[in-house]
Amino acid sequence: MREAIIKRAAKELKEGMYVNLGIGLPTLVANEVSGMNIVFQSENGLLGIGAYPLEGSVDADLINAGKETITVVPGASFFNSADSFAMIRGGHIDLAILGGMEVSQNGDLANWMIPKKLIKGMGGAMDLVHGAKKVIVIMEHCNKYGESKVKKECSLPLTGKGVVHQLITDLAVFEFSNNAMKLVELQEGVSLDQVKEKTEAEFEVRL
């Protein structure tokens, strides 16, 4: 399920892109890159993230924004958070791939808090959804109770309004434009009826 999401998201990466991967599921996309020159950025101050380290080669001083140990590629650079967010807010990130708790039919994103639950803060997502040239959200289509996370309107506090360009779930791929949500692709083995049944949001079919 998660593997299908990650592999599909990796297809959106293009040669020479500067890409920010959100915490959690999006970080796994870096492991799918092969033979392309993609520069991954992390908002804690790193440009040039590599794949996850192999056992026995972990450097505890190298971590991403989610505090996971990582590797770096030749030519990687390190800098402070002010410079990192200047890159993001200045429009220098070609693509941000973020996780999501809810996405609405007009491209609103909620991914930073659940009311009454302890959180560390909003992180860099609010800057990324407005600074990156393209925003892709990857997430499971339904929550653990089987309820759709693809909503008519988000019920959780918003990260950004109308900021999502593309949504990739374990069931389908959607694109957003002109305040409309369009189904453009089904995941392997998934039917249109399954997507309709599991989706609260209204969408156009553009298969």
Curated annotation (Swiss-Prot):
- Reactions performed catalytically: a 3-oxo acid + succinyl-CoA = a 3-oxoacyl-CoA + succinate
Recorded GO terms, molecular function?
CoA-transferase activity; succinyl-CoA:3-oxo-acid CoA-transferase activity
Q: Name one Pfam family in it.
A: CoA_trans
What the entry lists under InterPro entries is as follows:
3-oxoacid_CoA-transf_B, CoA_trans_fam_I, CoA_transf_AS, NagB/RpiA_transferase-like
What EC number is given for this enzyme? Answer: 2.8.3.5
Active site: which residues?
A: 43
Q: Which keywords does the record carry?
A: Transferase
Q: Superkingdom of this entry's organism?
A: Bacteria
Subunit comment: Heterodimer of a subunit A and a subunit B.
Family membership noted in the UniProt record: Belongs to the 3-oxoacid CoA-transferase subunit B family.
Return the protein name.
Succinyl-CoA:3-ketoacid coenzyme A transferase subunit B
- What is the organism field in this record? Helicobacter pylori (strain ATCC 700392 / 26695) (Campylobacter pylori)
Lineage, uppermost ranks: Bacteria, Pseudomonadati, Campylobacterota, Epsilonproteobacteria, Campylobacterales
Gene name of the encoded protein: scoB
